[in-house]
Amino acid sequence: LGDVYKRQAPFESVLTHGFVLDENGRKMSKSLGNVTSPQDVLKEYGADILRLWVIGSDYYDDLRIGKEILVRHADHYRRLRNTLKYLLGALSDFDKKETIDYSDMPEIERWVLNKVYELSKKIIQFTQNYQLGDIYREVYDFCNDDLSSFYFDIRKDTLYCSSYDSIERRSC
């Protein structure tokens, strides 16, 4: 009501996309049997997979959805979730009083913090330009490639074997 009274829209901009098509680019039709209903997606995969599909789609074009696309997003979701669970586990006993100064950190921790900084700059730029799919891809690539496949693999032994008060473990 306040927006009606002020005679201004309750938003700054509107983002639209093309039609939603099947994964082969065909119009969905009950007679073709290629309809993917949001209710079915929610039942089988959950709301988070549907959200990832939306944000990962190129809204400049028609959106495609189907079994293979949803399976891929479910796999990405699982990988992102596992990465975040690993981070939460590694940080569960973190005490801010034991923070290590950046200059005292091992090189690999400085590298990963730089990657986080670069990622945050990209996310801000992509957000300002409504490049939502690029945000998703950058975050996924960072979590999957830089963290899970590289950094975590190197630092597992440090987390499990180094003494709790060592600089290496506290830097992780």
Named regions from a protein language model:
Residues 7-172:
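Long, charged, mostly alpha-helical binding arms that flank functional sites
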Residues 1-5:
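Short, small-residue-biased leader/transition segments that mark boundaries at the very start
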